């Protein structure tokens, strides 16, 4: 199905549900339909670079739009959290950040900042010749040797260079680390991790994280909703 009704679209899409009956349906890709925005909608409704979907398509088909450092000519390409959207010809660069009101927002960044992406490890897989594959949240995979793989654990955040995927740094969810909520009712809240309540009878994914925001308020959520983005301070701009 190429389109969906606007009433069936994810609640956070910044589109008028009264203006038109249909909207673009994201293609299958690195993000689920429920947590992504079609590239044409990004260009028209979020970045305001086009007045219609047709105009947005022209911009995309001309190869002017990059997602994570690669030209994307699919107007239904799914854009999700922490993706980098670039229009170099217009000197425009954006990072998709979690937002407490609209779930996702496009934060303007510099061309230098657009060279880096932050993404969580969802699991590790052993492949041929004993090498380890790090499977990341946005669908990409990175191969490392067994010794290097010992440094990386599930739910760690990797800072990678685009589009080479070279690992530049990594961040663990630990007390005093800096994190941001990427899911749950407090999505978008960020601050210092104050406590990690590990489940005694269940796996680590049931752990509860307590975070203190910059205004001194504390929030709790499941560890699956948390992304580490720094050690004692954020490694990226989140405001």
Swiss-Prot record:
<keyword id="KW-0689">Ribosomal protein</keyword>
<comment type="similarity">
    <text>Belongs to the eukaryotic ribosomal protein eS4 family.</text>
</comment>
<dbReference type="GO" id="GO:0003735">
    <property type="term" value="F:structural constituent of ribosome"/>
</dbReference>
<dbReference type="InterPro" id="IPR041982">
    <property type="entry name" value="Ribosomal_eS4_KOW"/>
</dbReference>
<dbReference type="InterPro" id="IPR036986">
    <property type="entry name" value="S4_RNA-bd_sf"/>
</dbReference>
<dbReference type="InterPro" id="IPR000876">
    <property type="entry name" value="Ribosomal_eS4"/>
</dbReference>
<dbReference type="Pfam" id="PF01479">
    <property type="entry name" value="S4"/>
</dbReference>
<dbReference type="GO" id="GO:0022627">
    <property type="term" value="C:cytosolic small ribosomal subunit"/>
</dbReference>
<feature type="domain" description="S4 RNA-binding">
    <location>
        <begin position="37"/>
        <end position="99"/>
    </location>
</feature>
<dbReference type="Pfam" id="PF08071">
    <property type="entry name" value="RS4NT"/>
</dbReference>
<protein>
    <recommendedName>
        <fullName>Small ribosomal subunit protein eS4</fullName>
    </recommendedName>
</protein>
<keyword id="KW-0687">Ribonucleoprotein</keyword>
<dbReference type="Pfam" id="PF00900">
    <property type="entry name" value="Ribosomal_S4e"/>
</dbReference>
<dbReference type="GO" id="GO:0006412">
    <property type="term" value="P:translation"/>
</dbReference>
<keyword id="KW-0694">RNA-binding</keyword>
<dbReference type="InterPro" id="IPR013845">
    <property type="entry name" value="Ribosomal_eS4_central_region"/>
</dbReference>
<dbReference type="InterPro" id="IPR014722">
    <property type="entry name" value="Rib_uL2_dom2"/>
</dbReference>
<dbReference type="InterPro" id="IPR002942">
    <property type="entry name" value="S4_RNA-bd"/>
</dbReference>
<dbReference type="InterPro" id="IPR038237">
    <property type="entry name" value="Ribosomal_eS4_central_sf"/>
</dbReference>
<dbReference type="GO" id="GO:0003723">
    <property type="term" value="F:RNA binding"/>
</dbReference>
<keyword id="KW-0699">rRNA-binding</keyword>
<dbReference type="InterPro" id="IPR013843">
    <property type="entry name" value="Ribosomal_eS4_N"/>
</dbReference>
<dbReference type="GO" id="GO:0019843">
    <property type="term" value="F:rRNA binding"/>
</dbReference>
């Amino acid at each position: 199905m190429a389109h969906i009704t606007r009433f069936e679209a994810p609640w956070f899409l910044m589109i008028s549900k009264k203006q038109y009956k249909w909207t673009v349906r994201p293609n299958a890709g690195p993000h689920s339909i429920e947590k992504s925005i079609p590239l044409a909608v990004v260009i028209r409704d979020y970045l305001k670079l086009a007045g219609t979907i047709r105009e947005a398509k022209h911009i995309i088909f001309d190869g002017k739009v990059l997602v994570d450092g690669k030209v994307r000519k699919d107007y239904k390409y799914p854009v999700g959290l922490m993706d980098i959207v670039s229009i170099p010809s217009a000197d425009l660069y954006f990072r998709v950040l979690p937002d407490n009101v609209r779930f996702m927002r496009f934060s303007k960044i510099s061309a230098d900042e657009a060279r880096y992406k932050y993404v969580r490890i969802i699991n590790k897989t052993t492949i041929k010749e004993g090498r380890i594959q790090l499977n990341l949240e946005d669908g990409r995979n990175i191969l490392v040797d067994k010794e290097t793989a010992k440094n990386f654990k599930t739910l760690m955040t990797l800072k990678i260079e685009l589009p080479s995927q070279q690992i530049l740094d990594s961040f663990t969810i630990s007390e005093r680390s800096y994190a941001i909520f990427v899911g749950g009712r407090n999505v978008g809240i960020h601050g210092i991790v104050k406590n990690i309540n590990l489940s005694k009878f269940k796996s680590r994914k049931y752990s509860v994280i307590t975070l203190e925001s910059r205004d001194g308020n504390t929030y709790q959520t499941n560890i699956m909703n948390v992304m580490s983005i720094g050690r004692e301070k954020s490694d990226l701009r989140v405001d």
